[in-house]
Swiss-Prot record:
Protein name: Ribonuclease HI
Entry binding sites for Mg(2+) 1: D12, E50, D72
Record-linked Pfam families: RNase_H (PF00075)
EC number: 3.1.26.4
Location, primary (coarse class): cytoplasm
Originating gene: rnhA
Amino acid sequence: MTELKLIHIFTDGSCLGNPGPGGYGIVMNYKGHTKEMSDGFSLTTNNRMELLAPIVALEALKEPCKIILTSDSQYMRQGIMTWIHGWKKKGWMTSNRTPVKNVDLWKRLDKAAQLHQIDWRWVKGHAGHAENERCDQLARAAAEANPTQIDTGYQAES
């Protein structure tokens, strides 16, 4: 059995307004090589961008990997590590019997995460963590670039 590649992934989401124009930023490191990704949407929320960033990163990987995924989003980390299990048991309903917000992205993140061994880590945002700061720059630049792409999942919830 071959050993899985160890990939370090850093993600961040940004939104100007919430809702408003938004973007995500990703920095991926593997054996000294760095790949950056970002994209923006015309109308979305900060939480949707915080979820979309790890989804895009994980979906970009072509094989199962061992991943250390670092984000400044407690919402994303708590959701994928803790809340999602109850949501799935309850048919994607919260403990208050209301539909889970951003369910389209939670389902995508859950599916993308299944292929990998992931250590979900949290870092305080805007605290000088180099990769997190870079993700923030990428996400903010994508949100500020007058994006025209539509976040169809957000539009459906409006």
